[in-house]
Amino acid sequence: MRIRILSTAEDDLIEAYKFYETQSDGLGTYFLDTLYSDIDSLVYFAGMHHVVLGYHRLLSKRFPFAVYYRVVEDAVLVYAILDCRRNPSWIRKKLSKG
């Protein structure tokens, strides 16, 4: 199964990377490594996660982030990577744009 990270999700990753890098030098890189590892696991586990707001939601193991994706034919499309600490109405609004 192929994984495709859409530009909206890439933007989410960049924003979170910048935030964590300002917290501690190297933490942003650790964040990216962790999230990419979580996303890579979708090759084996895509479609097994709960559906939330029309997307499957993978919760990151080390950071309070969720990966929102859909399985389309033989591909996993990652639409958003969002901080779970955000206001739920903000998350709904963000996902409704996809």
Predicted regions mapped to residue ranges:
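Short, hydrophobic secondary-structure boundary micro-motifs
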Residues: 29, 50-52, 90
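Arg/Lys-rich, positively charged N-terminal/basic patches that mediate binding to nucleic acids
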Residues: 1-32
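Amphipathic alpha-helical recognition patches that constitute DNA-binding helices
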Residues: 4, 26, 30, 57, ...
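Enriched for short, Lys/Arg-rich terminal
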Residues: 70-98
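Basic/aromatic recognition patch in beta-strand/loop cores that engages polyanionic ligands
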Residues: 37, 44-76
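Residue-level recognition of specific faces of alpha-helices
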Residues: 12, 16, 38-41, 57, ...
